[in-house]
Amino acid sequence: VLFPLPWQNEKHPTDPRGRTNGEVMREILLWRSKFVLPPTTLGPLLQMSACLTHHVSSKDLKRINDLVPKIAIITGDWDQIVNPSHSKHMHKMMPDALYEVWKDAGHAIHIQFPFTFNKFLRQWIGLPPVHD
């Protein structure tokens, strides 16, 4: 759900064992799960409810556009969590925001393309690039 299947099947660029992106991501997510408390019964239900009922009106989006000095709306063209058309609508209501659609990207752009995302973010907030 978070990552496009073709990307999951590609060889991970830095994995010394030559595994795919999907294999590396599964290992990372399993490792991270060891450090979080198991959810309560109510937790996942409330999260689903929040996702299903969350709404920000066009009026509120315009107000955010007017009050927040710097906004970036970044979406993947393959986002299965937030339909890219919703991000496009957000930009329509917040025309001062930077708007980018990343090709072949899912919902977790910062995980799928960490180096590209960090480079973008550093440039966008005015920090110098990090040299390898």
What are the roles of these predicted feature ranges?
Residues 49, 72, 98-100:
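Structural signal for short hydrophobic segments within the conserved structured cores
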Residues 1-33, 46-49:
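Helix-rich cap/lid subdomain of alpha/beta-hydrolase
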Residues 63-68, 93-94:
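Short, conserved loop/helix-junction motifs that constitute active-site signature segments
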Residues 80-86:
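Conserved alpha/beta-hydrolase "acid-adjacent" motif
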Residues 88, 92-132:
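Catalytic active-site module of serine/aspartate enzymes centered on a nucleophile-bearing elbow/loop
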Residues 60-63, 86-89:
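A short acidic, amphipathic alpha-helical/loop segment
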Residues 67, 73-75, 79:
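Short beta-strand/loop motif that positions the catalytic acidic residue
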Residues 33-60:
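Hydrophobic, aromatic-rich cap/lid helix
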